[in-house]
Amino acid sequence: MSYYAFEGLIPVVHPTAFVHPSAVLIGDVIVGAGVYIGPLASLRGDYGRLIVQAGANIQDGCIMHGYCDTDTIVGENGHIGHGAILHGCLIGRDALVGMNSVIMDGAVIGEESIVAAMSFVKAGFRGEKRQLLMGTPARAVRNVSDDELHWKRLNTKEYQDLVGRCHVSLHETQPLRQMEENRPRLQGTTDVTPKR
C-alpha cells in the first residue's frame, strides 16, 4: 500500500478495511470499518479531509480530493463506481455514484440516491433522498425504485464481502504461461446481476 504523511497528518485505516496495494492515500484520509479501496484509487488529503465511512467502497481508478477546510465524505455503505471523481462533496448513506461520474465541490448526493454512470454533478448541487440523477449537468429524473435500491445494496454487499476475500486470498504472483485445464470461475456472494 502507498501511504504518505503530509504536514504531520497520516492516513487512518481501520484494521478491517482493505486497501489495494496500488491505491494511494495521502495525508488527512480516514477510512472506516469494512471499507474497500480498489486498485489505483487516489485519496489525496493534502488540502481537505477525506472520510470514507463504514462499509463503503471506492473502486478502481477513483479520485477523492477537496479544498482546504472542507470534508469530502462518502457515507456509510456508499458505493463509488470505477473511475469516479469526488471533489469536496458529500455522498449520502447508501448512495451509489456510477462509473466515470464527476461530483463537484459542495454538492450533496442524498441518501439512497443513484447517480447514473458518466454524469456530471455541478458544484453546489443539493440532492434529496432517493433520487435518480443523470446527465451533464445531472438532474433528478425520478425517485429510485425499491428494486433499484435492493440491487444497489446487493452490489454493495458484494464489495463488503470482497474485503474479507481479499484479506484472505489476494497476493502478488507471476502469470501462468497458459490457461490450465478445467480452470474454475470465481463466484460472488450474492445473486446480483447487471442492471439493464
Curated annotation (Swiss-Prot):
Pfam families: Hexapep. Pathway: Amine and polyamine metabolism; carnitine metabolism. Residues 174-196 are annotated as: Disordered. GO terms for molecular function: transferase activity. The keyword Transferase applies. CDD domains: LbH_paaY_like. Changing residue 54 to T: In strain: O44:K74. Residues 187-196 have a biased composition (Polar residues). Changing residue 126 to H: In strain: O44:K74. Gene3D superfamilies: Hexapeptide repeat proteins. Keywords: Repeat, Transferase. One of its GO terms (biological process) is carnitine metabolic process. Overproduction of CaiE stimulates the activity of CaiB and CaiD. Belongs to the transferase hexapeptide repeat family. This is Carnitine operon protein CaiE. The gene is caiE.
